Curated annotation (Swiss-Prot):
It is a multi-pass membrane protein. Signal peptide: none annotated. This is GPI inositol-deacylase. Involved in inositol deacylation of GPI-anchored proteins which plays important roles in the quality control and ER-associated degradation of GPI-anchored proteins. One of its GO terms (cellular component) is endoplasmic reticulum membrane. GO terms for biological process: endoplasmic reticulum to Golgi vesicle-mediated transport; GPI anchor metabolic process; protein transport. The gene is BST1.
Length: 1150
């Protein structure tokens, strides 16, 4: 039999009655225990007195009959009366005497205690229902994320023959990171000439920066293409060489696969190293002994930076460092780089570094004068892979809150001509079609005749827009108005060599070369000033660009000759006579439209994807105001023999070609959007849907068209696009299309200019109107497909919101414990919270999310007229979307309760996983201990039943660990150690609770188990930094982190864990001080929901504060004294209020 006597708290009006409650376990007759000894006089059972009862009990074997039980009762009563009379010592000074007597002297209290100590595995029906709902929602999200609304990818793997030359001269004399990082030069075998004496530095320097845990070898795809393209093409173009084009020398930074995405100090170290590398690279070109040096060209003063993933952030950080050489960087291209926000917010240094770097760039571009802007000559291009990138949300690649359109932009790979495919996080560094565009754009911006090695900023931006944008954007530049007349066209009066269309007549050509010799088709340009405005659209399957030498078609814009006053009188260099010697002829002076040609994917009956490896279409689009100085659009068929192909051109009214919609999101959800286009319609139609701008929703588009009676020129094609950032997706041969976008996303900072994404999505439709059939479009919200969009946008929420639930559960456990003395299980407390505090808190958070979204919309609308001016940049609150859901749309209020349900289910799953782990380890422990046969529990109640280490050894171990934290190891390592120790404590507590069937041991186990669950949810915040530290050890980098050695960030955790290893239960508090515990846990819960996503690193520190308060309760519940401190350290029984276990019988393990 196990006795559990407990002294009563001091009562100013003592009563002369003593009650004894006997609790027998009917399931196991060998286990009986005295539950309580209650008396009015203050008392405490001392260990020496407790052994008297145990000695009497141990006189024979374990008793199981009623007679034996009666003997035990008599022994207990007589012994208890003697103890009560001789031990007037109060146990809990913070406990209310009246409340204790009221709770402990009633039969109802005993029933409550029995109910409170039920099996921790038991799950109530309500908790089970919520958990099943959470699992169902999570399953839908995962299925949708992996299988629905997934963008197709069409990257082809390139081939290369790499050689990496390590620059050993870049040693510790040049940088303090020489032993940790490295610098390489890429050479293509069989193409680049190099030797040990001459490594072949003759071109423009480019430095590739890998991303998080990335290798410098990821830059080989770009470097190989640069070598091959210059070797095979450019070196034979003398005109290009005269304009300053040279080869590219690709250098690569080796960061030893360091993890800058998890640690801010690592990011700063890499940026410092890159600046040292830039200085060294430029010094190689300044060496007068360098072979092949051209004395007629200036030495380079800048290096082009290309960054992948976090390498792009390193590139931007370079310009903010103290060792940065002014103007050593003026061009930065980044791929899948999270510019707007850090990928995770678990490290304070990383969050602060992001904030400082972004503020620097915003401040620089907010300056009114160029002289005050250190980034005036810098161009920054951010390229995103789209939905296929499952590492970095492509929303984070946006530059809209950092850089004005004059200095940079964000574009998606699905937008880039002749790429037209989404990419994942890794393939964007090697995709064959994409790398070709990158390299060709770099060759177009370099100019070795300038010391900067690049063209002026405006010219660079023009080149990048030409290569990376579709050419149909509002900001797209048209080269035609700025060009000189290049062709003098002479036409005869015969109809065989030319045809002149009527005003507003459409031109359709099916096949070319129907006659010998060229034939011209003249489309009169309508006079300007009409309402509505008109625009020209021309589409053909023939090549029209200037790089095509054997073109079958030419498109010219012509005026009468001689020119009118005010126009250039320079005679054209090309004379094209199609008159056939006719006496009466028409002479026109013309400009070619070849430089304004837009490439579009081919759309035929066999087309599947835009990135199919087939020749593209050529498209021209001009507003009428761009054609005011011309009279004719002339299409010249130059094919000498019959040649298959087609062309369609027309002038259309904007009222017919642009269809605005005013449908709201609510109506779109209920009824969808249906548009019927008539048979007589323009070839190109723009459908604008401003209500669709959120990146959280996905849609389904259905296009239904009538089969063409004759030969169809092309199948319907749809371009889905938004303007901020530049994201376009092409759907060829379209019938059904999955629509998703990267528009307004959660937690994104406001734009520094007009928010183009807020204008919504648009659909540009190309259809063959010659089929004379109507066309039906249907757009509906894809609810199931939209669920998967939550995974990437709110992935940190799934770590922050569960901490809210755990905090409320612990708060409920302490409330019940302070009232009854029983620390209920995690599942019991969760059941109570679901019935009380959790719904109320999530309801309040829902109203808060709606009000925040409404207020943000109001403020953004009121500030929008001045948003673009530099003078108002400082008033923009770039942290406006950091709270809660991070959304400006009140429509998504339902996400708060949705995440609440998921969080509850996640906590239940983690709780059961932890319990399975604890019981599995306990079973292993039992097996190991069973080899020793019988185990004798120490008869002394103040000896630890958990750990065999002495107090002195525990103090020494803790002090040594704290010393290491202060000097060498990060506190995150100590936290992981604390989690392991707490796990072992849970295993010990669980084993003793099962073996003794004691309510006190059950309470202690529930307490340490809940603390362990709390620590588990903080563990991911600390593990990532620990991974960085372990990686540094692996590469023999022993320099300690500067910001992760705060002893006070781990001291409360270590003290609490060490205290719990002694088996000491936290004292009850029934005074007003108990409300501090409740407030602290509620504050942790509220912060987890409101700021947990943006500032997740603070969750550790707030939890640390809560733990410090619990440590204070352990140490100073009876007032500050060395005696209380010694009691906590040496107490070992795990019984509440420091009462010892008096069961000293010998027991054999099962």
């Amino acid at each position: 039999m196990q006795g559990r006597p407990n002294g009563a708290s001091g009562d100013p009006n003592p009563r002369n009655d003593t009650s004894v409650t006997i609790d027998s376990d009917s399931d196991n007759g060998s286990r009986h225990r005295i539950a309580e000894v209650r008396g009015s006089s203050p008392s405490q059972i001392v260990p020496e007195k407790a052994t008297i009862l145990n000695d009497k009990v141990k006189a024979g074997p374990c008793l199981s009959t009623e007679k034996d039980l009666g003997i035990r009762k008599q022994l207990a009563l007589s012994h208890t009366e003697s103890i009560i009379a001789s031990n007037p010592i109060a146990v809990m000074p913070l406990e209310s005497p009246k409340q204790r007597l009221a709770m402990e002297s009633s039969t109802e209290s005993h029933r409550l205690r029995r109910a409170r100590t039920r099996n921790p595995w038991i799950c109530s029906g309500l908790v089970l229902f919520v958990t099943v709902s959470a699992l169902l929602i999570l399953s839908i999200i995962v299925y949708s994320y992996q299988s629905l609304q997934v963008d197709p990818q069409g990257c082809r793997t390139p081939s290369m023959r790499p050689t990496y030359i390590k620059l050993v001269g870049f040693d510790s004399e040049h940088t303090r990171f020489a032993s940790k990082y490295g610098l390489y030069l890429y050479r293509e075998r069989g193409v680049d000439e190099y030797s040990e004496e001459d490594i072949g530095i003759k071109g423009v320097p480019v430095l590739f920066l890998p991303g998080n845990a990335g290798s410098y070898k990821q830059g080989r795809s770009l470097a190989s293409e640069a070598s091959l393209y210059f070797h095979d093409v450019l070196q034979y173009h003398q005109e290009r060489l005269k304009t300053g084009v040279r080869g590219l020398d690709f250098f690569m930074a080796d960061f030893n696969e360091d993890m800058a995405a998890f640690h801010g100090q690592t990011l700063l170290d890499q940026a410092e190293y890159v600046n040292d590398a830039l200085a060294y690279i430029l010094s190689l070109y300044h060496d007068p002994r360098r072979p092949g040096r051209d004395l007629n060209l200036p030495d380079p003063t800048s290096v082009i930076l290309i960054g992948h993933s976090m390498g792009g952030i390193v590139a931007r950080t370079v310009l903010t460092m103290s060792n940065y050489q002014t103007n050593s960087v003026n061009t930065i291209i980044t791929m899948s780089t999270p510019h707007a926000r850090p990928p995770v917010s678990f490290d304070s240094d990383l969050v602060h570094t992001y904030k400082q770097v972004n503020n620097y760039w915003r401040e620089a571009y907010s300056q009114k004068w160029a002289n005050n802007n250190p980034l005036w000559h810098v161009t920054l291009i951010s390229i995103a892979g789209g939905g296929g990138d499952t590492i970095v949300p492509s929303d984070y690649t946006s530059l809209s809150s950092l850089v004005p359109e004059t200095h940079g932009f964000t574009v998606f790979t699905t937008t880039i001509p002749n790429v037209w495919t989404g990419m994942d996080h890794l393939s964007i560094a090697w995709c064959d079609s994409f790398r070709k565009v990158i390299i060709r754009s770099l060759f177009d911006v370099i100019d070795v005749r300038r010391s900067s090695q690049t063209k002026q900023r405006a010219d660079r931006m023009s080149v990048f827009k030409k290569w990376y944008l579709t050419g149909m954007e509002v900001s797209a530049e048209r080269k035609l108005p700025r060009k000189e007349h290049t062709t003098l066209l002479t036409l005869g009066d015969d109809t065989k060599s030319k045809s002149i269309l009527r005003q507003d007549e459409k031109l359709t050509l099916r096949g070319f070369g129907h006659r010998k010799g060229p034939k011209s088709h003249l489309m009169p340009i309508p006079p300007r000033g009409g309402v509505p405005e008109k625009k020209l659209t021309l589409l053909t399957d023939q090549k029209l660009n200037s790089m095509e030498t054997n073109r079958k078609l030419d498109v010219l814009f012509c005026s009468d000759f001689p020119l009118r006053a005010g126009q250039s009188a320079t005679l054209p260099s090309l004379n094209l006579d199609l008159s056939g010697g006719s006496a009466s002829s028409i002479r026109l002076v013309c400009k070619s439209a070849a430089e304004d040609v837009i490439s579009l994917p081919t759309s035929t009956s066999s087309s599947k994807f835009a990135f199919d490896n087939v020749p593209s279409l050529s498209y021209l689009q001009y507003d009428l105001e761009d054609l005011t100085e011309y009279q004719f659009v002339v299409v010249i068929d130059k094919a000498e023999t019959r040649y298959p192909g087609w062309l369609h051109a027309e002038f259309s009214d904007s009222s017919d070609s642009v269809i605005p919609t005013r449908v709201g999101l609510g109506r779109l959800l209920s009824a969808g959007l249906n548009i019927r286009l008539p048979a007589e319609r323009p070839m190109v139609i723009d459908i604008k849907v401003p209500a669709l701008h959120s990146s959280l929703l996905a849609y389904k588009l259905h296009v239904e068209s009538k089969d063409c009676d004759g030969t169809e020129l092309f199948k319907p094609m749809v371009r889905q696009y938004i303007s901020g950032p530049y994201e376009s997706k092409f759907f060829v041969n379209v019938r059904d299309a999955e629509i998703n976008l990267h528009g307004i996303a959660p937690y994104m900072p406001p734009h520094i200019g007009d928010n183009a994404a807020a204008t919504g999505i648009s659909f540009q439709l190309w259809s063959d109107a010659s089929c004379n059939g109507p066309l039906q479009l249907s757009l509906k919200v894809d609810v199931l497909g939209s669920m998967g969009k939550l995974a990437m946008r709110y992935r940190t929420v799934f770590a922050a919101f569960p901490l809210l639930v755990v905090s409320l559960v612990l708060r409920q456990q302490f409330k019940v414990y302070n009232q009854t003395g029983i620390f209920i299980s995690f599942m019991q407390a969760l059941d109570l919270c679901i019935r009380s505090s959790i719904p109320l808190l999530f309801l309040g958070l829902t109203f808060l999310a709606s009000s925040l979204a409404t207020s943000k919309n109001t403020l953004s609308k009121s500030a929008s007229p001045n948003a673009g001016s530099n003078s108002t940049e400082s008033v923009i609150d770039f942290s406006a979307n950091d709270l809660l859901l991070g959304s400006q749309d009140a429509f998504f209020w339902f996400l708060v309760p949705l995440f609440g349900i998921i969080s509850i289910g996640t906590c239940v799953i983690v709780n059961y996983v932890a319990m399975i782990l604890i019981h599995a380890l306990g079973a292993i422990r039992a097996i190991l201990m069973s080899r020793k046969g019988y185990i004798k529990h120490d008869e002394r109640g103040n000896t630890s039943i958990f750990w065999s280490l002495s107090t002195k050894n525990r103090v020494i171990n803790t002090a040594v660990l704290l010393l290491f934290v202060a000097t060498f190891i990060p506190y995150q390592f100590a936290y992981v150690v604390a989690c392991v120790v707490q796990l072992v404590t849970c295993v010990q507590a669980s084993w003793h609770a099962r073996e003794t069937r004691s309510a006190s041991h059950s309470s202690f186990y529930n307490y340490v188990h809940s603390i362990f669950i709390l620590m588990i949810w903080i563990l991911p915040i600390n593990v990532l930094v620990l991974i960085v530290w372990i990686h540094d050890l692996a590469v023999h980098w022993l320099t300690p982190f500067s910001s992760n050695h705060n002893v006070f960030s781990i001291l409360p955790f270590m003290l609490l864990v060490e205290t719990l290893t002694c088996g000491t239960m936290i004292p009850r508090i029934t005074t007003h001080l108990r409300h501090i515990t409740y407030v602290l846990f509620f504050f942790l819960a509220a912060y987890s929901a409101i700021y947990g996503v943006t500032y997740a690193y603070l969750l550790h520190h707030i939890t640390n504060l809560v733990i410090a308060w619990l440590v204070g309760i352990h140490f100073f519940a009876g007032g500050f004294s060395l005696r209380n401190l010694s009691r906590v350290i040496n107490d070992s029984d795990g019984v509440p209020n420091g009462s010892p276990i008096t069961d000293g019988h010998i027991k054999k393990l099962p």
